[in-house]
Amino acid sequence: VRIHPRRGDALSEKVRLEVLTTASRRDGVRLQIERTIEQNRKIFDFKLQELPHIESAITALQNGTGDLVAMSALDWRNLDVEGLSIVGILPRREPTWVLVSNDKPEYLCSKAVVVCDNELLRRQMRRLRSDLIILTSEQFAERIGKLDAYLNLDEEDRIHWIEECRQDKLLEGFVVSRGEHSALRFKSRRHTLGLQREKPERTHFVPPPLHGFTLLVSRTGFPSATVLPMFDPSAYLAHRIEAALLDSLPKEIHSLVGIFVEQRKFKTILKEAQRSNDDFTNDSFLDSNHAQGKVSGKNLTGSAKWERSVPKKGMSTSPRLEIKVETLNYAGTVTASAERVSTLEESHMSMVNVLKEFMNLLETMQLDHEEMVRKFPGLPEEYSLARPPLMDLHSVQASSSEEE
């Protein structure tokens, strides 16, 4: 880190930063760091140096070259980063994935072919539409007799090949991360596979963990206070919680679990609850004695009931941390999920509680149901019979559409 006086102001100091980066890795990092540098040029004197690949950038930083390396959260987990630490995290990009298709997923034709290389997203797509034919890229290439041609392509060219096949009507759509979509040569129509907070009647998609983060990494001991203006504390907290949750789960289910952590305003949560007629959330935060339905003596429900409500006495209106975790069986017919909203001060305990709830739920759903000796009047005899586990995460049972 070098410091220069600003021209015309000998008392001002401008921090010089050498940032190491790579060509686009289809994860959104390169584009975001370029925008961040442009937005902060009045504060910092940047030098952006491109290296051939992320491994060489990390090695250069470890050997004393440069000040910072911009990388994704997944690279941070998967590569050798000994001697380095996270200085800060840029504002999080949208982590949800997209369906590249002419139609929304609900309106795809029956038995439409959709390519997706992420196991979690494949299961979520089956939950939405059990009739869809969900294939990996290799399965699709083999299906149309072009597996060798596909395997001979460079990795960065394969997504373009899939898009060309879609334009040739060999498939109806494919699911990719937003970074991969932005790398397409032609920006085709996309549909967000999101949380659907404003439309709870639609199938939701909790994204794979740790997507959308751009980490700025430096050698341990770097004076992080000098670069604080670039960073987003809420993104740092979300990354810490998501990474801790993922590390606490069994490795064999990492590819099957969706995790999403976000800091949200108190008012935003309430407005959303009123739009979706979520009386549970409203009743948790608001004083029901001041709800319009009781003041006027009318039996109102939904948003009208809470129009004149106020937060409960002693209820903090500070931002909240929302945590969502889910997994599905192969066919997408059974989902195990846990979620919690807490204050930022209670974020660690909230994470611990969500983890306990999720693991207990998962364990219970994977147990065999023994035959019940006691009979319950009014219930069919089948109710007491022994049953297999409600959820089997690992058995691969092809759906009828794929068998055909």
Pin down the residues of each PLM region.
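Alpha-helix capping/helix-boundary segments
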Residues: 75-76, 120-122, 180-181
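Small-molecule-sensing regulatory modules
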Residues: 2-55, 127-404
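Short, hydrophobic beta-strand segments that form beta-sheet elements in well-ordered domains
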Residues: 69, 113-116, 174
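Short beta-strand-centered segments that line the small-molecule binding cleft or hinge
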Residues: 56-98
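Short helix-loop capping/hinge motifs at secondary-structure junctions, enriched
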Residues: 104-108, 121, 221-227
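Secondary-structure junction motif
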Residues: 117-127
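Local beta-strand N-terminus motif with an aromatic residue
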Residues: 65-66, 111, 171
